[in-house]
Structures are given as C-alpha cells and as structure tokens.
C-alpha cells in the first residue's frame, strides 16, 4: 500500500511514448459522464458486478477459480436483485459444465436477453462441444466469463494458466483478456456490447487467482452506464452490417401490412381493398417513418370497422425495415422447432464460409467501436492492443493477462537505467489484431512473448502476423497489415504455469536475454533444469541429461537479485496462518481499510 490523495489517483509516470491504460487520466475523469464507482474488489467480484446489472440469466457449474463469479451473482439475485431493465433474472446450476453451456446456449437462443456462463480449465474442455455450437449459431449477447486456469496434465493443479483459453481459439469466440480487476470488469461490458453488435459470442478472460482473487482498487461501471452503453437486449436496432440486414433485417411495415391484407382480403369491400393496396404502394417509402401515425389514420377509411383494432396493432407493431432485435431470438419457446439439423457436405461448407466471411470478419470493427464508445463514456481507454513506452523502444515484452502489469513495473525500472524497453499487452486474443501488433513491433530489434502455457499459442499468432507483414513488403496479400522488410527476433518465455511464482528478477533476465548476442529462443522463467548439487550421483545423472538433451542447458536463465520496484513509502503486510482461521477474510478487510479509510493504493492476494 502506498499513500495517495483520498479521491484522486495520481497520473502514472509518463515517457516519450503514449500510454494506453485502463485507468483514466485524473483531469479527464471529471469530464466524462461515468467515471466509475470507487471500490476495492477482486476480479471475480468485479465481473459479477457487471453481470448483476446486465444479465437476464446465468447458468453455471462451480469450478475453481471461477466459482465465485456465479456465487456472487446468485447471492444478488436471491436477495431480490433485478437488472437495469427492471427484470428479475434467473440462475440455474445443472449437473456439470457440459450441461451448463448447453443450457446457457439454449437460454441465449430465445433472444432478448444477455446470458452468461462462468467456467475454467477442465470445465471449459468438458463443455467444448457446446462452445463450438454456441459460436456457430450466431448467438449475440452471450459472454462466457473465464478465470483462466491450467488444464491438469502430469498432476492436478487449480492455479493460473492459459490452456483453457487457448482451447477455445478454434471455436470462434471473440476472446478478450484483462490484466487486472478493473480491466476484467470493463472488458466484460465491452464483451456484451461487441457480441450484441456482431452476433458472435464472446469470452472474457482473466488470470485465475492472479486476477480473479486479487483485490485492488476498481472503478465499478455504474448501472446507468451499463444501461445506456449496452441497451435493452429486447429492443430493436438498425442492422449494423449488410449480412445481418439480409439475414435478420425486418421486411418493414409495407411488407407486413400487405401480408395482413392477404389473410383478411375476404373481410374487405373489393374496391376498398384495392384502394388500400394502392395507398400503401404510393406511400411505401414513408410507412416506416410514420411515427405520428398520420398515415395510419388516413388508411382507416378503407378498413372495415370490425378489424380496425387488428389493423392498428399490425401497423404499430410492424418492425422497421432493416431492423433486428438487439439480441435476436433464434427459437420460440411457445412454438418449439429444430435448430442445427444435419446438413450434407456442400451445405455445411457453405455455412462455414458464410459465417466466417460475412459475420466473423466483422468482429474487429465492432470491437473497436465498442471500445471507443466505452472510452468516451468512462475515460478509461481501451484498444485491442495496449502499448506502453513502445514508440521509442528497441526491445518489447509482449504478453496477455496479469503479467503485463508486472512487465510495466519492470520496464519502468529498466527505462530509468536508460534501457529502451516497451510493453505490449494483448486485450483481444481472437480474432488476433495482427495489424495492431505489427504497428507496435515495427522497427524493433527483438520481442519476448510471455507465455502462460506450454502450447505457446500467443507466440504462434505473433509469428504468423510477422510472416504476413513480411509477405506484404514484397506483394500486398494481407489487407491492412503493414509490410515490414526487417523483422524483430522472437523469443518465448514460458512462465507461471500452475501459478508458479514470477519475480521481477525473472523479467529482468528475460530482457537481458533479449539484448544478448545469444538470445535464447525458448526458455522457462523460474525453473532450473540442473542444480548445483555436490552429490556425485546427482552430477552423473545431470551429465547424462545434458548430453542427451543439450538444448535444456540454455532453457533456464541466470537471475540476479530482485530490483526494488515499490515506492519508498510503501508498506507490505504478510499473513501466515493455517486454513480455517479467517486469514483471507482478514487480508481483504485490511485492504478495504487501507484504501477506504486511510486513502492508500491497496492490493492484496491470497496464496
């Protein structure tokens, strides 16, 4: 904890480069309509706060470390809480994660509501079949909340890792990844907005425990902000893309009134029927704009008195041409039908091609739109890729999740020593913002990708973007991606698997490796392959391994002492106890006191 003014956050130390951060500039904070509600909260609670005010329903099954998201939401609902549209939401706990996702998908298919599930690790893999179907059915307004956790391999582990998020990549979700509780909350709101615009479901991820259980200062999105920013999921909006207008767009009042006349022609005088048809045709382009209903009143002269009530209802409730429900209904519980029947080969491939070309391809622009709108309302700036100190940097630390906050602290320390290092934090994992990443890496000597998974999917995405930029330098084949004639060298630093501790000295070592002549391409932070044992037996075994696997000698970096990154006035408190003695609750309470009563910047983490 460090001292601060009670109601004002000091600006972060600047540099020659632009800072793109989720914390608002203090000067801007007073100017925006929704600066946020000050609180101290962990990531799970910050996400649940958004869900409480937005969701019409949640179907979830408990799994560490995301369980608390649904628990907090259900506690709010069970105590009589309603969402910002004055609707009482529902919650259901099924018998497993596969059923949870299937049920959430079914609820979302009924339209007119924001629906969520919360899951992690094996829970996501268990429901993976339903996740693919959820993305393929163009379900808008659905957000999967993820507290990212490793998938058990050589043993069980419930701590942080990106295996589960990477497993979702081929499903087609739009995937966001926050670095702290503030970003987890803000990106949750952005995820609902982008999903309702694109009709592609979204996943909002944060690191398990490192963010989900980490308490820090949060500016909660106000309920009124969420109501204004997201909009009622049951209301009508203009279709925001050509493909959506073709598939979902209403045919308009002219078509619907003529459809009514076809079913009621025998109830009309023939001459009056023809006159009414001519009247509608003459005013076809004005019918949708008849909000004052003057044309409606004029039309009644030809409508039989006994069906004028039905005619008025048809007129008033006809949907405007080209509009759709904000979250479209794809099934009707009152008229059950089949979705996703069996298709033969050409139809199935055509459906995939249509989905990717006409719907998924629109996601990047809708994400940018959602982020820009949110920035305007809150002052908290978001981009698919956030950059810090990159404009003048030669060396880049690139990552995703809580590690990027750590990387910023280490980068600040290194820059004070004259070392030109910057940080790139990926907020939109899928679809991967290749052009933004290339612009951030343009002209750099080297980049180290910080990977919280052994599958190194983020490295693969970065390498693919670099390859396409190199192709574009010779012949433009990939629109929008800047062409690079020289590429930075890319290294992969695997860290934090299963919550493995990451210290500042490890990131300093990653930087030193990057600027060295050797620049090892793949290594593990915090792990040692060989010990300094004096045992002859151990030394003999180690020599065998070194001889058989010589590459492992360089896969662990030498580290020095931890640099001192905290301000001099900061205080640190550490609790030691055994389970059941209320230590975590005491730590949370102390964090609240330090922030709310003493006005200190506060952060706490259970171990």
Q: For each predicted feature, which ranges?
A:
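Thiamine diphosphate
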Residues: 3-166, 172, 189, 208-209, ...
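Anionic-ligand anchoring segments at beta-strand to alpha-helix junctions in alpha/beta enzyme folds, i.e.
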Residues: 57-93, 365, 370-373, 377, ...
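Short, solvent-exposed amphipathic alpha-helical segments in soluble enzyme
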Residues: 74-77, 132-134, 192-194, 219-222, ...
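Conformationally flexible catalytic loops at phosphate/diphosphate-handling active centers
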Residues: 85, 89, 202-386
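Glycine-rich beta-alpha junction loops
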Residues: 149-150, 207-213, 401, 454, ...
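Conserved thiamine diphosphate
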Residues: 156-208, 229-252, 486-497
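Core nucleotide-handling region used for phosphoryl-transfer chemistry
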Residues: 417-446
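Peripheral docking tails and interdomain loops at the edges
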Residues: 450-562
């Amino acid at each position: 904890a460090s001292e601060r003014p009670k109601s004002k956050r000091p600006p972060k130390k600047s540099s020659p480069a632009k800072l793109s951060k989720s914390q608002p500039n203090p000067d801007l904070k007073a100017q925006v309509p929704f600066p946020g509600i000050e609180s101290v909260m962990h990531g799970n609670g910050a996400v649940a706060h958004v869900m409480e005010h937005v969701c019409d329903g949640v179907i979830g099954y408990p799994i560490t470390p995301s369980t608390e998201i649904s628990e907090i939401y259900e506690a709010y609902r069970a105590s009589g809480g309603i969402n910002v549209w004055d609707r009482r939401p529902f919650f259901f706990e099924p018998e497993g994660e596969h059923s949870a996702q299937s049920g959430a998908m079914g609820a979302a298919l009924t339209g007119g509501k924001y629906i969520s599930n919360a899951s992690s690790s094996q829970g996501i893999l268990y429901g993976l079949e339903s996740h693919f179907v959820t993305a393929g059915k163009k379900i808008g307004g659905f957000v999967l909340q993820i507290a990212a956790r490793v998938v058990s391999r050589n043993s069980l582990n419930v701590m942080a890792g990106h295996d589960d998020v990477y497993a979702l990549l081929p499903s087609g979700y739009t995937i966001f990844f926050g670095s702290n509780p503030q970003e987890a909350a803000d990106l949750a709101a952005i995820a609902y907005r982008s999903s309702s615009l694109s009709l592609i479901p979204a996943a909002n991820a944060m690191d398990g425990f490192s963010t989900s259980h980490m308490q820090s200062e949060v500016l909660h999105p106000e309920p009124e902000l969420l109501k204004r920013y997201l909009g009622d999921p049951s209301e009508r909006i203009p279709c925001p893309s050509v493909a959506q207008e073709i598939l979902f767009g209403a045919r308009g009042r002219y078509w619907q009134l003529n459809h009514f006349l076809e079913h009621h022609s025998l109830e009309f005088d023939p001459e009056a029927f023809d006159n009414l048809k001519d009247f509608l045709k003459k005013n076809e382009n004005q019918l949708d704009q008849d909000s004052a209903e003057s044309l409606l009143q004029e039309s009644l002269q030809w409508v039989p008195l006994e069906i004028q009530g039905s005619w008025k209802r048809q007129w008033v409730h006809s949907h405007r041409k080209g509009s759709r429900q904000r979250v479209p209904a794809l099934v009707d519980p009152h008229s059950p039908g089949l979705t996703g029947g069996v298709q033969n080969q050409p139809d199935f491939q055509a459906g995939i091609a249509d989905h990717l070309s006409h719907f998924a391809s629109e996601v990047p622009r809708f994400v940018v739109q959602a982020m820009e709108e949110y920035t305007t309302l809150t002052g908290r700036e978001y981009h698919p890729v956030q950059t810090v100190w990159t404009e003048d940097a030669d060396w880049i630390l690139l990552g995703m999740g809580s590690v990027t906050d750590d990387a910023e602290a280490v980068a600040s320390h290194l820059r004070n020593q004259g070392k030109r290092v910057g940080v790139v934090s990926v907020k939109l994992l899928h679809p991967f913002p290749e052009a933004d990443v290339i612009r951030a890496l343009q002209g750099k000597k080297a980049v180290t990708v910080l990977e919280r998974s052994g599958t190194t999917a983020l490295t693969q995405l970065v390498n693919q973007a670099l390859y396409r930029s190199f192709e574009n330098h010779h012949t433009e084949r990939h629109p929008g991606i800047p062409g690079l004639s020289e590429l930075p060298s890319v290294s992969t630093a695997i860290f934090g698997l299963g919550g493995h501790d990451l210290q500042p000295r490890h990131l300093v070592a990653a930087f030193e490796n990057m600027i060295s002549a050797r620049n090892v391409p793949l290594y593990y932070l915090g792990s040692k392959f060989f010990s300094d044992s004096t045992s002859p037996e151990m030394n003999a075994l180690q020599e065998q391994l070194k001889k058989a696997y010589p590459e492992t000698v360089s896969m662990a970096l030498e580290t020095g002492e931890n640099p001192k990154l905290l301000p001099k006035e900061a205080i640190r408190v550490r609790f030691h106890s055994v389970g059941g003695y209320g230590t975590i609750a005491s730590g949370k309470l102390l964090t609240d006191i330090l922030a709310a009563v003493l006005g200190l910047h506060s952060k706490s983490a259970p171990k």
